[in-house]
């Protein structure tokens, strides 16, 4: 299971996940206003041929991570990048409307 860090500032939530050896085309991210899901499915096949024998090895791995977010975000404005095994997701917070007092009559 990948290591995941969640950081928060005034404007956004940043999620960093370590996904070494995974191709970015195998990563899927789904987000709602208060949660995020990161998953990947990796299938590899290695074939080695030498005189007199053939060796084939297959490997399959997958992971799924679902996390609640500490505050409400706008998933439609989320961005992500993947570089050297590190996935970074930025989720802008939704603007909280100012409270208005309502006079009871």
What kind of region is each of these model predictions?
Residues 1-105:
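Alpha-crystallin/small heat shock protein
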